[in-house]
Amino acid sequence: MKTAYAALAAGLSALALSGPAQAQVEVQWWHSMTGGLNEWVNDLARQFNESQKDYKVVPTFKGNYDESMTAAVAAFRAGNAPHILQVFEVGTATMMSAKGAIKPVGEVMKQSGVAFDPKAYVPAVSGYYTAPNGEMLSFPFNSSTTIFYYNKDAFKAAGLNPDKAPTTWPEVTLAAAKLKAAGYKCPYTTSWMSWVHLESFSTWHNTLFATQNNGFGGASARLAFNSPLHLRHFENLANMSKQGLFVYKGRASVAIPSFVSGECAMFTGSSGSYADVSKGAKFAYGLAPLPYYQDVPGAPQNTVIGGASLWVMSGKKPAEYKGVAKFFSFISTPEVQSASHKRTGYLPVTTASYKLTEESGFYKQNPGTDVAVTQMIRKVTDKSRGIRLGNYVQIRAIEDEELEQVWNGKKTAKEALDAIVTRGNEQLERFQKANKS
């Protein structure tokens, strides 16, 4: 008995000397990923949590991008915002203007003493999320761009070369006509109408989407996409729609299942849709660069970034910011970046991760998976760097509303584009007035 008491006393003494076990620092991460991408986000957090014992990242789905931003604003006002918020690319200007609500990622990394080199990131990606003073504001995460998908089996059935995707928009029209003649009721569709056919279309053709270098030059930017080139493209799409060669399926990513199921033979959308296509398509498919108009000088240039970045909210403790910095460092390693790129189709946002993926033989084994990267690693121009406009969530809704009038035959392409520019500029004027320094 004495021996047992002695052992117990010794144990308690040792426990007292060692002190209480240090609790893990929790880092709350709000995101908008669904389906397989939600699993990917959870896996990243789990891998980081298992790699060390000091920090625990807790991912939470907060609805689509609009909903998560709204929830974050409410949470910030209530004093319980997350540490990390995933924000889609068109919310960049809005987040930049949210003075006091965010902490620049460059500042977070520096103050936490965690190595961080903005030059390691693909310029077209890092440039989008960088302030005029050169400081990176948010952390590139699920960066994507617009690409062309096509059903090789459908091409073969229509007498088209399954190994040769259309490279120009006139070729897309001709391919669509052959597919329709072969019995396909949906030869071509698209997701993200404004991103693909207005934003990326503009940068791909090295033509202005808005003045002030698409908003990068200042808040006085105004929309400029009712140009002859944009009008030509939308008149062509309107004619394709009337002939049943282009079928509008809906806003945002609604059209993806129509391609994956085999209903639609050609599809333009996010490189991030590769995860859905590779998992669900029961046919041979191909990936190719976005089509363009061959007679436009400077085309093709580069497509515009999509997806989202991770913003760090203000008002947290230094220890928590260090956890954020450590997590960002972990998910930006070449190995983690490369694995994420292969799994999702999102861009490898660092040059090192792209090279690692290339050296692994992935692109040779999966032809076309490098298309998104090659479209983005080109040197950008002032016209093709990206889009940075305030109130752009509202402007995108206006774009969808007006263009839907074209697809249902109620407006001409010119009427719709002019209306978007007029209504959109009203939103830009409001944003400019609300954010005068």
Residue ranges and their predicted role:
Residues K156, P162, G183, Q375-S437:
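Conserved C-terminal helix/tail region of periplasmic/extracytoplasmic solute-binding proteins
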Residues Q47-Y121, A157-T167, S258, A265-M266, ...:
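Extracytoplasmic "Venus flytrap"/periplasmic binding protein-like
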Residues F88-I147, T173, E199-T203, G286-P289, ...:
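Hinge/lid segment of periplasmic solute-binding proteins
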Residues T130-F141, T146, K156, P170-R222, ...:
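Extracytoplasmic/periplasmic solute-binding protein
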Residues T94-M95, K99, K110-Q111, G272-F283, ...:
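C-terminal lobe and pocket-closing loops
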Residues A74, P82-H83, V114-A154, C186, ...:
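A structural signal for short loop-to-beta-strand junctions that line the ligand-binding cleft
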Residues T173-L179, F216-K249:
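Glycine-centered hinge/linker elements that transmit conformational signals in sensory
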Residues S32, H197-S200, T207, L231-G323:
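Extracytoplasmic/periplasmic substrate-binding proteins
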